[in-house]
Amino acid sequence: MKNIQNLSFFGVCLAFVVIALGAWTRLVDAGLGCPDWPGCYGFVVFPTNEAEIALAESRYPSFPYDINKAIPEVVHRYFAASLGLLAIFLTYFSFKLKEKNNIKWWSLGLLIFICCQGLFGYLTVSLKLLPIIVTLHLFGGFTTLTLFFYIFLRSGNFKSVDVMKIPHLKVISAVAFVALLIQIFLGVWTSTNYASLACADFPTCQGTYIPEMDFKNGFNLYQEVGPNYLYGLLDNPARVAIHYSHRVSAILLTIIFLILMSKLWFSVAAPMASTLGILLLTQITLGIINVVYVLPLYVAIGHNLVAALLLLAVFSVNHLAWKK
């Protein structure tokens, strides 16, 4: 079981790195830094000399080669692929366990899910950053992180905090988890549609609290297949609708989190309330900085990573609340 615990913990750390690399790739507009998959302009890594670059551009004349965009894409791909290799080892050791448990099935499910993530990685490139595909791919990254974390919790002999006596904790923690998933989806949808700066001021949006918004086109999940979606194709009102929804959802999520934290604070689980509070405050601050300072790269990456930490924190509360 120790092997499972170590591998799953390493998986959590590696998945965290992959999420950061994915955010980096997206934020520097390198999603099509390699227009093919799994190679890069037909090379195992990426073209480096003049002859290789000339060959690469002859293969894909519609995609001029830019090494500054190829590097983030290739690095992200190889780190993501290493998650699959790690999941293979995890599944192998899980099936060797003599104890009766279902960790082996969770490990196998994780391996299958990572293979599906690879497929979505291919579709992300082949469909030229189609927003719904990119959104599902990024959401899958958070799911991969959570699955590794769940296996880590199941494999470890951790001292549990008794939260069973906290009234209505199951319901409140479940609502908080679902609300956070919705907020993460809205954040990812904002990013994949290049709507992060649709509202360039705060707390207003384009100088008003009720800007012009187009929800129909902003939340059209079935955008046309074929066009290149790099930099986004939505008009301003549609992007504003996406961005503003993410802001309003953040307010609602904060209220739900405050209720959850109040339940945890007056119990033996007070440290969990403190953790949630610190992460929530950090995330709100990073979100505001992203708008006010026009999406600084490392702040925007941090915004993604704190979202991942919030997900693990709320998942931990649910794990304790629903644990038999």
Residue ranges: model-predicted function:
Residues 93-108, 167, 261-276:
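Membrane-interface helix-loop-helix junctions at transmembrane boundaries of multi-pass membrane enzymes
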Residues 30-72, 196-236:
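Extracytosolic (periplasmic/ER-lumenal) interhelical loops and adjacent juxtamembrane/interface segments
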Residues 10-21, 105-124, 175-183, 271-289:
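Small-polar-interrupted transmembrane alpha-helices in polytopic inner-membrane proteins
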Residues 6-38, 179-190:
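N-terminal signal-anchor transmembrane alpha helix
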Residues 71-88, 132-144, 241-259, 300-309:
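Membrane-interface loop-to-helix entry segments
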Residues 25-36, 115-138, 190-201, 239, ...:
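Interfacial helix-loop-helix junctions of multi-pass membrane proteins
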Residues 1-10, 324:
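N-terminal membrane topogenic signal
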Residues 150-172, 312-324:
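A juxtamembrane structural motif centered on a specific transmembrane helix
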